[in-house]
Design a protein with these regions (language model features):
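Aromatic-Pro/Gly-enriched surface loop or interdomain linker
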Residues: 24-80, 285, 294
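Metal-dependent polysaccharide deacetylase catalytic core of the NodB/CE4 family, i.e.
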Residues: 108, 113-130, 135-141, 289-385, ...
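C-terminal domain-boundary segment and adjacent tail
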Residues: 59, 241-256, 280-300, 390-410, ...
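Active-site beta->alpha N-cap acidic-glycine motif
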Residues: 228-318, 366-367, 374
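Short alpha-beta junction capping motif
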Residues: 32-35, 75-133, 137, 207, ...
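Catalytic grooves of carbohydrate-active enzymes
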Residues: 247-276, 361-371, 375-379, 388, ...
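An acidic, glycine-rich "communication" segment
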Residues: 114-193, 506-508, 518-520
Length: 671
């Protein structure tokens, strides 16, 4: 061992000892000041937003002047990174004392939000706490279906949401009356019937930032797996989420980067495939800065054209491969009544073996990310993907078939969920349909990866068909990293700064690349939801590493030097021997389906009518199957009738011929 290696190991050991000694909670805290200990809606919103960001919560009651000492102590605590005061508590507080308690030596003062303001809130208090910028609060009726929230362009608190609209789901809204000459800046405003009123405002009082938000009424948002539900959920919490993200900064859960990906389903390596020209698409990716993953059907493992193999091998920064089922014989991972789980496990195993063979033949790696054909599988199949060490699954819905969407805000606002078999299931958007830019802005604001998918027919108008979406994403977030699904899965974790200078990490995927991009060495306290249903081993940079089990969480502590990174892999034991699995194509049914699919994509889709038929069939498959079945039956009956008619005609001709022969014979006899 060299002296440099020895020094490095000693440094890591010291970091480990320090980390082990620091096992208490080090989360930053939000102080919530209320008039009473009741569970008001404003408090519920604060708790939901703080929980989303992984922030601790310290609720204090300021019901009378004797509670002021406790309140000020909580505000001065070094862990406090944000203070929220319920408007009802303002009469018992002294603004000079509280604003003084928010100041920090050498750093930014702790931001303050006064929340839950209504038309009953004393205007004199609002003027005092805003240095005259806010004169009061009024109610605005909202006609159903006409209201929205507008986000101001000119502030960093809401970026990149500036200029977009959010749904206003309530039947009424309250807005703040601003004094235009006192410097109050609106961040979010309610808009209805031509009237616009600020609902979230920032002011500055003696150098201290003070935010104000109006109260809104609870609204019932249906619990569904629909990704567009995110708009309504986010809108109901927008001021709290904006304020706490701004106030907490690195102390709040945040992604390791801004990621995006385009996936084209069904493709294999032939040129062209349908409307996809690989070289032409590469030029568009280079000009408009995006990355394309091919969702590759393992059945095609040995059909790749050499020129396309060379193109992909030369451009791994633009092209990548993930797994798309196995045979793709319609919904092969569908309900167990028609697609038994044991058969699905066999498809997973054979799919891996075929992809391994594909990599051997082409020297192109593939990402162990499953895109299910047609729709996502039942939940137990996700456990099987995990068993065989898949990184994640990405589909139009992230809720397995037959399962119910989780009711929590975390599910609605995150791209990935661990609610099913503690395996990461990601949602993605079809770029073949219109995607509201406000939806993409929310994903960027929350740090979610923006995942898109299309089929080859999307490029019927040309290889530049995706450019507008890529340009929009890059404009919203100029440092967006367009990467493969595998890269994104390995960076699918959240981190936040602790008050001891180390970092908490919450990982989704079983394998992650954890980089210390900070200026100092640090210990990373890593946690992952885990049901421990399978035997597992944790490895760091290929070597076994100790971990703890705490309920349904796997915990480990990992020191990392500044500017370096480590790979953490949770490996699940299984009996897979890919080399021993038969990868041949022996099913006549599957072979016929795949050949017909190639014919559909490479011939039928070339015409406008063909593309219409493909879209219509995909959207209305049961109806088309019934229609085609009826047409086939009518055709069969028609052919049968024609056959019988011709058979009857031939029979009559034979009878007539027999009579003619008999008559001729009788005539010869008489002669």
């Amino acid at each position: 061992m060299t002296s440099a290696q020895l020094t490095n190991r000693i440094t890591l050991l010291v970091l480990w000892i320090v980390a082990t000694a620091c096992v208490s909670s080090h989360a930053a805290e939000v102080v919530y000041v209320d008039q009473s200990g009741g569970q008001s809606f404003s408090r519920q919103q604060m708790e939901t937003a703080a929980g989303f960001y992984g922030l601790g919560q310290n609720a204090v009651v300021a019901g009378n002047k004797r509670d002021i000492v406790t309140t000020l102590k909580a505000v001065r605590d070094v862990k406090t990174i944000a203070v929220i005061i319920a408007a009802d508590a303002l009469p018992t507080l002294n603004e000079e004392q509280l604003l003084s308690a928010l100041r920090r030596n050498g750093t930014r003062s702790v931001p303050l939000l006064i929340a839950g303001i209504t038309e009953r809130t004393d205007p004199r208090l609002l003027r005092r706490w805003s240095a005259g910028a806010i004169n009061g609060c009024k109610e605005m009726p909202v006609e159903k279906g006409t209201g929205s929230y507008a986000i101001d362009m000119g502030n960093e608190v809401a970026q990149p949401l500036g200029g977009y609209k959010l749904p206003l789901n309530q039947s009424e809204a309250r807005y703040l009356m601003l004094e235009s000459t006192r410097g109050g800046q609106w961040i979010m405003a309610a808009v209805s019937n031509g009237t616009q009123g600020p609902v979230f405002v920032r002011t500055t009082v003696g150098g201290q930032e003070v935010f104000f938000s109006t109260a809104n009424t609870p609204v019932n948002i249906p619990i569904t797996p629909d990704p567009y539900r995110e708009l309504a959920v986010f809108s109901s919490l927008a001021p709290q989420l904006m304020f706490l993200r701004y106030a907490a900064g690195e102390h709040a859960w945040h992604s390791s980067g801004k990621f995006a990906n385009l996936t084209i389903d069904d493709l294999w390596l032939r040129e062209p495939y349908g409307h996809v020209d690989y070289a032409g698409l590469l030029r568009e990716m280079q000009l408009h800065n995006f990355h394309t993953t091919l969702a590759f059907i393992p059945w095609n493992f040995d059909r790749s054209e050499p020129a396309m193999v060379s193109l992909l091998r030369a451009h791994p920064e633009r092209y990548s491969i993930c797994v798309h089922g196995n045979n793709h014989d319609h919904q092969e991972f569908g309900p167990y009544e028609t697609h038994p789980r044991a058969r699905q496990v066999n498809d997973i195993r054979q799919g891996i073996a075929r992809m391994e063979r594909f990599s051997q033949l082409t020297q192109i790696p593939y990402d162990a990310v499953m895109v299910f054909p047609h729709s996502i599988s039942p939940a137990p199949t996700l456990a099987d993907l995990k068993h065989y060490n898949y990184l994640a699954t990405a589909n139009s819905l992230n809720v397995p078939s037959g399962s119910v969407a989780p009711s929590d805000t975390e599910f609605a606002l995150r791209t990935a969920t661990m609610a099913f078999s503690t395996f990461p299931s990601l949602r993605r958007y079809s770029a073949e349909a219109s995607i509201p830019e406000s939806q993409l802005a929310i994903e960027t604001f929350l740090g979610n990866p923006a995942l898109f998918y299309v089929h080859q027919g999307f490029f019927a108008a040309g290889m530049g068909s995706f450019n507008a979406i890529a340009d929009t994403v890059n404009r919203m977030q100029p440092d967006t990293q367009w990467r493969s699904l595998g890269y994104i899965a390995k960076h699918l974790y959240l981190e936040k700064l602790r008050d001891d200078g180390n970092y908490d990490v919450r990982t989704y995927s079983g394998t992650i690349r954890l980089d210390n991009v900070h200026q100092q060495d640090a210990t990373f306290f890593i946690e992952k939801d885990e049901d421990f249903a399978l035997p597992l081993t944790v490895r760091v940079d290929g070597q076994p590493y100790p971990y703890e089990r705490s309920g349904t969480r796997l915990l480990l502590q990992l020191p990392i030097r500044a500017g370096s990174g480590r790979e953490i892999a949770i490996n699940y034991d299984n009996d897979l021997n890919a080399a021993a699995i038969d990868v041949s194509r022996t099913s006549l049914r599957v072979n016929a389906i795949r050949r017909l699919s190639d014919f559909r994509d490479n011939v039928v889709s070339k015409s406008a009518f063909g593309r219409w038929f493909i879209r219509s069939y995909h959207d209305n498959e049961p109806d088309w199957n019934r229609t085609l079945g009826s047409l086939a039956l009518l055709l069969a009956l028609g052919m049968l009738a024609l056959y019988m008619r011709r058979s009857g005609k031939r029979s009559r001709m034979v009878q007539n011929e027999s009579r003619f022969v008999e008559a001729s014979a009788n005539g010869r006899t008489r002669n």
